[in-house]
């Protein structure tokens, strides 16, 4: 899938840099950059600016995080970590129920 159609709440994987192979959730989009968060190294109050071309869309989205951001509600670091943990666990099992595209 083309990274040009990334949306808020999408889960991406870093393809370059020190954080290569790390998962993030897209918090904000301003092409050619996205602002991402993992709730651990890059927390909600200090989101990471990343070039879109250095990321890979993994095909899933956190509906919970997306909905909170769309309604202007605050997302916590623990909610981000939980969403990413659920994605990784479901990926290992072979399916992800949060939201497929």
Question: What are the functions of these language-model segments?
Answer:
Residues 20-21, 30:
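Short, well-ordered loop/turn elements at secondary-structure boundaries
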């Amino acid at each position: 899938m083309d990274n040009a159609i990334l949306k808020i709440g999408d889960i991406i994987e870093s393809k370059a840099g020190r954080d290569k192979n790390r998962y993030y959730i897209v918090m904000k989009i301003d092409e050619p950059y996205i602002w991402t968060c993992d709730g651990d190294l890059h927390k909600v109050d200090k989101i990471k600016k990343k070039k879109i071309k250095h990321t890979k869309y993994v095909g899933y989205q956190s509906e919970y995080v997306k909905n909170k951001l769309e309604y202007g509600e605050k997302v916590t670091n623990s909610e981000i970590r939980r969403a990413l943990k659920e994605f990784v666990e479901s990926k290992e099992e072979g399916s992800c129920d949060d939201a497929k595209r």
